[in-house]
């Protein structure tokens, strides 16, 4: 008998992510008095990072659309950044801060008798409970989406009478986007345009930016006596009457307006509505919305830590990606150092990862702001192509601002437009949204193709060539750059399916006359003549003829990336994973090519991929492993990636650094003042910041280890390690909901057509698969062919909308249905080698 969560009578899975995610709560058993250990809560548009200080709480508030535009005439019309104009740029500013102060060290580690801080994923709430020799304190906070209001309730008891203070403030600053190299020494930057006031018992701070007027408002409700006063133009405060017990509820929100007066009115109206609704009703609505969010999909892995990272990724995206603009790829809505935003622009290679997993997880709506950003930028993309590249079509610079304007440097990477176009097309393939195809995907696809057609030149060999481009971020240019060719091979056929006549002929002709892949021999730094000496394949034998891919030609000579010898000047190329671009982002190579010589070549290439410190936080190794079916290497390398890059206890990653300094930089770093060029030292620890790339990449890899549909087939469990249990409810391109469960007793898979149509399903290797067509409780057995060497392939030509196909290795009579299993809340911290989620408990409480 096999126990399965698929209900044969009701044709549904008894799998509930809302019931499972409590096991993945983020739990601190000891207080960590640092913003980098903060708890993020957000309504999708406004985010609040809550962290502990020895005598209270601090909350840093961000909103996705608080734009400070560059002063008119400073930057060029079609460029986002003009060299030499530091701090005169278009960037997002923070909203403000709230501090709650007590007259005692309530969160000092030395005085804790009992302590728990918890980020509850199921209901997206943060809570803190502390018991000390001089009193007790409890806090709960959540951010409700519909109202745009965040709510915090606090109860405290102290041995001595105390008079807590709650302060709302905003202290603007420089953006310091190039913190790692240079700064403009203007300490007064960002302080103008701020005003604080107290009206009708509420606190407000307004801010006039160049381009945005906004207000952050705070109200306190409770029966205690309190006073409200303005401290200065940047801050206003509540002071509670002295007493041994205190209890109050805070409501805060951030609103924009045509001017600061309108913004303040919008703020006050939202606070009044929230106060009338009340905390309990707001929480009930909030918890129900999150329950619905979680139950759109489901994942269970054998590795609990990786599963936790997956659900943390979804939590963060729903908390910060429902506003008008996509969050930044570093700190997103969780920055905590005034207006500091490292790498302030939208860097294409970095931000694309955040959205790649969402459609398969059933949450493609969270990528809409990203697609809007790119669609709205098309006029600027066309201008940049004409002005800088002297070509028709759309050119997306790797670095753009909110208008789509590209930087005035490093304009040789031609791939972003094609990548974005294919991301949009993939979204359409999941949703079937014809309006989106018409207004978003096809215009971007046509513009990207038009640009590439203008770049292609016919060589003496009769083939098309591209000259002088770079792969990904700027490096020394090459000819016939691999990343360009793979994006053309992915984009042109996808677009050609929607074209006719001459337009289609041009696309087909270009693809048919592209050079083949450049293959190169292994060198001494790669292997010892028998085994690899570097990378994840160290100690393994190369496959086939032992060749790998080149990345292009420089001065007529083929170029490879350096692996075992990273200082080798002949082959060095600074940005990783170029040779693996056929796997991702192009998606033109994968398990469909198994058994071919090129599959051996790609395997060799993958085996040379670095690990740990040789592997950046933005590399796509988990996705490559999944797309090559390497379940045997998947989990261990994902964990290795976390050990190298998860820099913070709340799951955010750092830039491959250790200690308190970002990116592994030294404690002090020499900077250049941008105008005087004077050198001076800065404590780099001040510039610690989150990065949000490793989590999304791991989430995409996890999904693709369970389900793939980018090759035109639905491939189930393609990279799950033999003997490991797993289960999922995920979505496939073409409009299918796919469920799968694998245990030691067998495997059950369902494919439900959401809008009608055919599909091909590739199942894990087995000769014992059975198939059943299920329509409204009826069941008809299907013929399933015997499996091949690697997998069993089943074709269903016509499935009606809502129709389900059941595939199982166990006879129906030997399946025993089990119900939804509710997980208990996570009791404590979790560890993955040298990194952890949360912090350990106190003695006697673990």
Language model segments and positions:
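Acidic/polar, glycine-enriched structural segments that form the non-catalytic walls/loops
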Residues: 2-36, 41-344, 363-364, 374-383, ...
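Catalytic cores of secreted or luminal carbohydrate-active enzymes
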Residues: 88-111, 116, 688-739, 747
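A conserved hydrophobic secondary-structure block that centers on an alpha-helix together
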Residues: 132-140, 144-149, 421, 426-443, ...
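Carbohydrate-binding surface patches
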Residues: 145-154, 734-760
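Surface-exposed beta-strand/loop patches in extracellular or lumenal glycoproteins
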Residues: 162-171, 752-767
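Solvent-exposed beta-hairpin/edge-strand motifs
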Residues: 178-180, 762-779
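Active-site core of glycosidic bond-cleaving carbohydrate-active enzymes
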Residues: 347-383, 400-404, 409-434, 439-442, ...
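Acidic/histidine-rich catalytic neighborhood
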Residues: 447, 451-498
